Amino acid sequence: MFQLFCPPLGRSDHSCVYLAQDLCRRLPVGRKTIRHRNLNEQVLDDIAYDLLHSNWTYMYMLDDCQTQADYFYSVFYAIVNKHAPIEERTLKNNDKPWITVRFIELIEARNAAFKAGDRSNYNRLRNQVNRLRSVLQKNYYSRHIEHLKKGDSHKWWTSIKNICGIECKDQSVFENLTLHDSPVATNNLPDVINSFLVSVGEGIQPLNSSRLDELRNNLHDCPDRYIISEYAVYYALSQLNVSKSTGPDLIENKLLKNLAVVLAAPVCSLINCSIRSGVVPSQWKRSRVTLIPKCSPAHCIESDLRPISITPSLAKIAETFIFKFFDEHFNSLVDANQFGCTSNRSTTHALIKFSHHIFTASDTSANFIRILFIDFTKAFDLIDHNVLLQKLLDYNFPQHITVWSMSFLENREQFVRVAAQNSSTLKLKSGCPQGTLGGPNNFKVMINDLTFSLSYIKYVDDTSVASVSADHNDISLQTTLDELSVWCNKNSMRINVNKTKEIRVHFGKSVDKSKLTPLVLDGVAIETVNSFKLLGVYFNSELTWKHHIDYILNKVAKRIYFIYVLVRTGVKPDDVVSVYCAIIRSILEYASPVWHAGLTKAQSNDIEGVQKRCLRIIYPELSYNEALFVTGLDALTERREKAMRSTFDNIKKPDHVLNSLLQLKPTNQNNTRMRRKEYPYFIERAKTSRLNRSFISYCINHRF
């Protein structure tokens, strides 16, 4: 162990003390390898010219989809590699982009004066460092970043995040990972992770290829509504987001977008051939898996990493058309309690429905409410393709959509990338790739027949169930859990008992906890907790929003410093306000219709105080009301009220999924005419204040 006294940082008067163990090793400066093509205007013109004069007629005459794909990619790669070969660059970044040699020299001189004890010289140099830093930061923003907001907003936002230090990717989060409690060597990490991801589906039978071939051979002529127009493909290509990651085929979106006019016809032919024949080319069934840590740093490969599959952009375009056809058929069949990846439904709607049921039940103090939050283990990775195929047939999906969807999953391949390392490519026997459009849709089909007699909601794989009874040992929730276990065994799904939790809500006479029968799944008791985060919002056993408000306030407290950094860097106030709205206000307002009605005055003031503090940093000379006027912002309380009213207006529409929660006032049999301004909805008179915390009760009581 050694210690080192360093000069104060910035304008601080306090000296720094640096402590380190002798055995500590300094991590090397991060490096990353970037593979890219030089796609300037001249290169794009040359590529477009050669593609335009290629013999695509030969490709259009081919009946086999895989042969068409092979021809397309061979011609495309040959032309692109001729004019824009792939280049590799290794980048090293351990300094802020605005730092200059002069600035470093001043810092070294300041530190030398500090060590020598020359106080007057140190003060002079310290002031020079602080002044120069401020000038450099402001000049860097005005010269290199500010103009990007209009020309390239993505680069502007990336630069802003770099200034703040937001989401800095640090590969050290993948160090010291374990698999089955054994450490994994860094040099072998991608292969170990890929092998584990593939092994999750062990024991599940691969798709019965002969059955799929039989369905494919019996396909009728493709209906006209499933034939994609050349313009539709052109439009999809022209709308590609150039900032999105390049797929495993190494074809950049910038290339596809700029060549949309010349590529529309051959890509259209390839997609239509794929839909007609029910064959997805092998180039579209290969994924690069990127790992997203669920916590930082990640420790356990089994539970701390979320695999996201990056697929080729052309495959995504084909999926967008299939997604549309899927929705047209399944929207009328989807479970009314499924809110995930479904048109006109959201997490807020799911939470409103679930919380309304709980608040209504709690209005009767004798009721004992038990809420079960179910967590599926590797839900997407455990999808049995044979079970999925049968369910697609049972729901009478169009033949071409069924066969195409299953062909997309059959014999998929993936490799894992960690930093600049790629694993070997392995084949998958089960599951749906996360990050694709088809993944959530396929899981919705899998879980659509999972229904309960109790109140429940589903958001893709997040499932929550609540039982209400005057008997604290009511077995209805245990019966539901047993039914869930049977369903899982039948559908090759697994429940993560360790992450499945229960909350008990009761406001009547106290009940001896030792007399309460715990919920049991496969011989393991489900843990009872006082609070749980459901779809981003914390629920607790007291049915207050204390835990959730504390959670969002703690989360944004870490981000207020970013506002200070931007102001000090010289970023324009309007731009800082935009950043505030994106990274702070969005957190303070997430799902606000669910919890706004239950806020205390103090909690509302605490939330408003965050906006006051940020605006005080941006406009220190203005009062809060003056800052609101200058920025055009509304007070957060007003915004939450507007969100409540807007959400309720949508729910009042007869076709809204939550419209059934509204009760119309009974009409007078003697006078069926309703007075013009009479409010049409009513709610039972509340016995306690808890019912008034419900979104529905609040809106009706306030005559929204």
Labelled PLM ranges:
Residues 1-91, 169-172, 182, 186-187, ...:
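Surface polyanion/phosphate-binding segment centered on an Asp-His-Pro turn
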Residues 20-26, 47, 65-70, 75-78, ...:
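Surface-exposed loop/turn segments and immediately adjacent short secondary-structure elements
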Residues 92-195, 226-271, 276-283, 289, ...:
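Short, charged alpha-helical motifs in flexible N/C-terminal segments and linkers
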Residues 204-235, 279, 285-288, 327-374, ...:
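Active-site-proximal segment of RNA-dependent polymerases
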Residues 223, 419-420, 479, 494-530:
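Short, conserved micro-motifs composed of acidic
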Residues 242-251, 300-310, 349-393:
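Conserved catalytic palm subdomain of right-hand nucleotidyl-transferase polymerases, strongest
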Residues 322-338, 361-362, 440-467:
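Active-site palm subdomain of RNA-directed nucleic acid polymerases
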Residues 376-459, 468:
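Conserved polymerase palm-domain catalytic core
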